[in-house]
A protein has these predicted regions:
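Anionic-ligand binding patches
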Residues: 1-151
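Intrinsic disorder/low-complexity segments
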Residues: 161-162
Length: 162
């Protein structure tokens, strides 16, 4: 919050480093710590956000049309599913697991960084997991089940979600 929403949607390219992900993660984390400088802890609030969108054609089911997060664009009907993980940015990296900003992100109500969470524990609270679980629950009301639904909340590359 102290950075007015930065790095935002540009989080993977925050430091402008290209190449392997390990190098860019380290550069992004260094820049985040640098930019926050002496910002006090109470102003280091942050969040991970995922928004998934399910689109249907003009003949969308009534469950889509009546959903509180229904929208229409170019004749298509959609529903957005939001997942948010609130937390704080630490002053130094902590932990070896995860990826990206995980070593700097402390979840509300915990002293550990996300890089100290096990995969199952992290997926249970992650912004991606929350959004995918909401999507899966909605699809179940339509009588549909996505392929790979037993693995929603983790990605297909075998690493943890953030």
């Amino acid at each position: 919050d102290a950075l007015d929403g930065a790095p935002g949607v540009h989080s993977a390219r925050f430091a402008g480093v290209t190449g392997d992900s390990t190098t860019s993660y380290a550069a992004n984390n260094r820049l985040l710590i640098e930019r926050l400088g002496d910002v006090p802890g109470e102003r280091r609030s942050a969040r991970f956000v995922t928004e998934l969108v399910l689109l249907y054609g003009p003949e969308a089911p009534s469950a889509i049309m009546s959903h509180p997060r229904h929208f229409e664009v170019d004749g298509l009907h959609g529903v957005a599913f939001l997942g948010v993980l609130e937390g704080w940015i630490r002053t130094e990296a902590l932990g070896e697991k995860g990826f990206g900003y995980d070593p700097l992100f402390r979840v509300d109500g915990d002293t550990r960084s996300l890089a100290q969470y096990g995969m199952d524990e992290k997926n249970a609270i992650s912004h991606r997991g929350k959004a995918f679980r909401a999507l899966r629950a909605f699809l179940a009301t339509l009588g549909e089940q996505p392929r790979g639904s037993d693995d929603l909340g983790s990605n297909n590359r075998g690493r943890q979600t953030s």
